[in-house]
């Protein structure tokens, strides 16, 4: 609930109806610490993912294209995280100027949409590869994957435009601090409603439903195949992996989406209780830490579903350089069914079972 006051020296001066909301000493210590941890772990992990996929795996599969772009999107966001750490440590005083305020804010929004869209495409690709491997072969090409990623980056950039346009540096007169924040000229504006609903629906609900549907259909197809093979342990493993993927996405983002919706209600003046505003403003940076920390782990999480990725990742940690030239045959194992003959029965007499792997 922020009301416009005046403009001076190019910086708008405003009043905050709840000046103490979210301003707690433990937040100013805990959140910068968590941001620093996310920055170090995220930069290290995602950089290794980029190196493994591009230099070791040679970017030969559709899913590897999505994983590479996922890691790159995370790195773009992580580069701005130190700014937010300093901002929070300085008790929400923005010292970096208006341009960095816009760029850093747009980076957060860009990462949200790019990551969610890429994970959604990855789930669709996995569904097509496992449930319809033959029918989808002509559609699931490297060219299609790269064009899809370009479109995703453009859409994420478009979704980030409101942050560039409406996020600015403001001077709050009744607290005497300069903040980097959204500010709406009128509480009757439909803009916060539109942005909030876009974030809730396009940035979470629709992608989650697609991811849930894709992996449910994958599990049913694999369950049927393993029942024919009477391979119950393998079936249980696949179920656990799929459940982990779906729940990992859901619980990473649902807290942030809920408090984003509540924040919109506060901005519109529908919620006027400063106690509720304090809860929302206190919880928001915590939910951001949960969402974006898990987001930055996604490339590693998905990558480690594949044996080749794990193999090359461990080689990289041991400083074993990639081979100058790959002699492996053209493989689509990362995004198609792989088959393993039974140890006890000849492959000519027993149909092999499909394998859910990311390689």
From Swiss-Prot:
SUPFAM superfamilies: Family A G protein-coupled receptor-like (SSF81321). It is a multi-pass membrane protein. C-terminal Ser or Thr residues may be phosphorylated. Residues 1-25, 90-98, 166-190, 269-278 are extracellular. One of its GO terms (biological process) is regulation of vasoconstriction. The gene is AGTR1. Keywords: Cell membrane, Disulfide bond, G-protein coupled receptor, Glycoprotein, Lipoprotein, Membrane, Palmitate, Phosphoprotein, Receptor, Transducer, Transmembrane, Transmembrane helix. Glycans are attached at residues 4, 176, 188. Disulfide bonds join 18-274, 101-180. The chain crosses the membrane at residues 26-55, 62-89, 99-125, 142-165, 191-216, 240-268, 279-304. Angiotensin II binds at residues 15, 17, 167, 182-184, 199. Its main location: membrane. The keyword Cell membrane applies. Receptor for angiotensin II, a vasoconstricting peptide, which acts as a key regulator of blood pressure and sodium retention by the kidney. The activated receptor in turn couples to G-alpha proteins G(q) (GNAQ, GNA11, GNA14 or GNA15) and thus activates phospholipase C and increases the cytosolic Ca(2+) concentrations, which in turn triggers cellular responses such as stimulation of protein kinase C. Interacts with MAS1. Interacts with ARRB1. Interacts with FLNA (via filamin repeat 21); increases PKA-mediated phosphorylation of FLNA. This is Type-1 angiotensin II receptor. One of its GO terms (molecular function) is angiotensin type II receptor activity. Residues 56-61, 126-141, 217-239, 305-359 are cytoplasmic. InterPro entries: ATII_AT1_rcpt (IPR000190), ATII_rcpt (IPR000248), CCR1-9-like (IPR050119), GPCR_Rhodpsn (IPR000276), GPCR_Rhodpsn_7TM (IPR017452). Residues 335-350 have a biased composition (Polar residues). It comes from Pan troglodytes (Chimpanzee). GO terms for cellular component: plasma membrane. Residues 335-359 are annotated as: Disordered. Belongs to the G-protein coupled receptor 1 family. A lipid is attached at residue 355 (S-palmitoyl cysteine). The keyword Membrane applies. Gene3D superfamilies: Rhodopsin 7-helix transmembrane proteins.
């Amino acid at each position: 609930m922020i009301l416009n006051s005046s403009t001076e020296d190019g910086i708008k001066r405003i009043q905050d109806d709840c000046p103490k909301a979210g301003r707690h000493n433990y937040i100013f210590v805990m959140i910068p610490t968590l941001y620093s941890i996310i920055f170090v772990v995220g930069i290290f992990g995602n950089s290794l993912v980029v190196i493994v996929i591009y230099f070791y795996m040679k970017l030969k599969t559709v899913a590897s294209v999505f994983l590479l772009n996922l890691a790159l999107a995370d790195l773009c966001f992580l580069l701005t995280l130190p700014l937010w750490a300093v901002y929070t440590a300085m008790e929400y005083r923005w010292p970096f100027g208006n341009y960095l305020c816009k760029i850093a804010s747009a980076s957060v929004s860009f990462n949200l949409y790019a990551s969610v869209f890429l994970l959604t495409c990855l789930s669709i690709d996995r569904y097509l590869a496992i449930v319809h491997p033959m029918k989808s072969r002509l559609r699931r090409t490297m060219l299609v994957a790269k064009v899809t990623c370009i479109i995703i980056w453009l859409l994420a950039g478009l979704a980030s435009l409101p942050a560039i346009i409406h996020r600015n540096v403001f001077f709050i007169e009744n607290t005497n601090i300069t903040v980097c924040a959204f500010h709406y000229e009128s509480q009757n504006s439909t803009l916060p409603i539109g942005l909030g609903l876009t974030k809730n629906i396009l940035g979470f609900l629709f992608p989650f439903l697609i991811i849930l549907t894709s992996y449910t259909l994958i599990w049913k197809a694999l369950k049927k195949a393993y029942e024919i093979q009477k391979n119950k342990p393998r079936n249980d493993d696949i179920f656990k992996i799929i459940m982990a993927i779906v729940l990992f996405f859901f619980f990473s983002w649902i807290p942030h989406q809920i408090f984003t919706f509540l924040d919109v209600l506060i901005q519109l003046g529908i919620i006027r209780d400063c106690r509720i505003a304090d809860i929302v403003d206190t919880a928001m940076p915590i939910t951001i830490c949960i969402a974006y920390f898990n987001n930055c782990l996604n490339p590693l999480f998905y990558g480690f579903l594949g044996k080749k990725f794990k193999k090359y990742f461990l080689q990289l940690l041991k400083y074993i350089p990639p081979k100058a030239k790959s002699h492996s045959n053209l493989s689509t194992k990362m995004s198609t069914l792989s088959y393993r003959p039974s140890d006890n029965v000849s492959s000519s007499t027993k149909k092999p079972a499909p394998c859910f792997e990311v390689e």
